[in-house]
Regions:
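Charged, amphipathic alpha-helical linker segments immediately N-terminal to NTP-binding catalytic cores
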Residues: 13-56
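Long amphipathic N-terminal alpha/beta scaffold segment
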Residues: 40-80
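Glycine-rich phosphate-binding P-loop
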Residues: 77-94
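Post-Walker A helix-loop "phosphate-sensing" segment adjacent to the P-loop in P-loop NTPases
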Residues: 94-104
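PAPS-dependent sulfation machinery
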Residues: 107-209
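Phosphate-binding beta-loop-alpha motif at adenosine-nucleotide cofactor sites
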Residues: 207-214, 230, 268, 288-311, ...
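Conserved phosphate-donor/acceptor-positioning beta-strand/loop module used by diverse small-molecule
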Residues: 212, 223-248
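PAPS-dependent sulfotransferase catalytic core
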Residues: 244-276, 325-345
Length: 345
């Protein structure tokens, strides 16, 4: 069992903070009662929860010292999981005007360290150790979703600071927690998200933040509550192609933490969750203009990515220079030359 009382005592948590107590209790109860975690899975889940809560505490402490925080304009890349968001995100990352939180920054963010300095290299090394153990738990994950310590990663690794992240459902069978995620007040997660970016900006303020997480899909109102000037790029791909892929990925991840994998249950709950997210998105996006919210087709991204980049920049009135275009073209060429493992399921 994951001992809630011991975690509370070890971290000196204040569970009178209802923004923390509800997700904490729902998550741990779901892991204990439903997940059927292996011994190693319990250790991993407990470690992650404690790390996420430590970072949450540090965020609260540091944020108190920031006067009138304001975050640079963010671009959110959204869409169903496995719909091409990573390729689109990585293309946009070639623009030096864009900054995205790096994996190591979300794993070992505090205290802030000097860019390219010795302490940053030490943090990257610590994050590489996390990835080493991740590879031991989930050997095939890099073939399906490669992660590097010094590369941008998804916002689900920021939302964990609020204990409101679909990451936990990917890790383990947590149906009660997934139901909570579908119906909870996600402003709690975006409050942590905003605080985290505000802190990162103290060291390096970008022209624009570039952010990605499929679970942003049904949270446009909550995002705009903290980022009123946000822009959204929504990539559309047939769910018949995307949903089976994320179900397969979920099953692969869970094998590292449990020996009891119910593929039918994963499929049913995955469809229900993303159907609800999509319905929320359909109503919320009606409030936004085409200059704030742009839908793009997966086929266009694959067939002619550079032309799509030009369309995106023109739509949002962003300047696209030759240097950035060349970087994007180079990224595409490099990707086409690299041997990729096909996701079979």
């Amino acid at each position: 069992m994951i001992n809630k009382s011991k975690i509370v005592a070890d971290l000196k948590l204040d569970l009178s903070d209802t923004n923390l107590s509800e997700p904490f209790n729902v998550l741990v109860d779901s892991l204990n009662n439903e997940a059927n975690l292996s011994f190693a899975g319990k250790l991993a889940a407990k470690y992650q929860i404690k790390q996420h809560l430590r970072n949450r505490h540090l965020i609260s402490q540091i944020y108190e010292g920031i006067e009138q925080p304001k975050v640079s304009q963010p671009i959110f890349v959204i869409g169903l999981p496995r719909s091409g968001t990573t390729f689109l995100f990585n293309l946009l990352s070639q623009d030096s005007n864009h900054r995205s939180p790096l994996f190591w920054e979300m794993m070992k963010p505090f205290p802030l360290v000097e860019t390219n300095g010795y302490k940053e290299k030490l943090r990257i090394g610590q994050s590489n150790l996390i990835l080493f153990f991740k590879e031991r738990f989930i050997p095939q994950l890099d073939d399906l979703h490669a992660i590097k310590s010094d590369s941008p990663e998804e916002c689900l690794l920021i939302k964990v600071f609020a204990l409101q992240s679909i990451l936990y459902f990917y890790m383990a069978n947590t149906p009660t927690y997934l139901d909570y995620l579908s119906n909870c007040d996600t402003r709690i997660a975006y409050n942590q998200h905003f605080k985290f970016l505000s802190i990162l900006e103290r060291q390096q303020k970008p022209q624009r933040w570039l952010l990605k997480d499929p679970s942003h899909l049904g949270n446009l109102d909550e995002i705009l509550n903290y980022y009123p000037d946000a822009r959204f790029i929504h990539i559309i791909r047939d769910p018949v192609e995307t949903i089976p892929s994320i179900c397969s990925l979920t099953a692969q991840v869970r094998k590292g933490f449990s020996s009891n994998i119910d593929l039918h249950d994963i499929g049913k709950r995955t469809i229900n969750f993303w159907e609800q997210s999509n319905k929320k998105n359909e109503s919320q996006r009606l409030k936004l203009s085409s200059k704030e919210y742009m839908q793009v087709q997966y086929k266009d991204l694959i067939d002619d990515p550079i032309n799509l980049m030009k369309d995106i920049y023109a739509n949002f009135d962003f300047y696209l220079d030759e240097k950035t275009l060349n970087e994007m073209t180079g990224y595409i060429k490099k990707g086409s030359l690299e041997e990729k493992v096909k996701h079979k399921y």
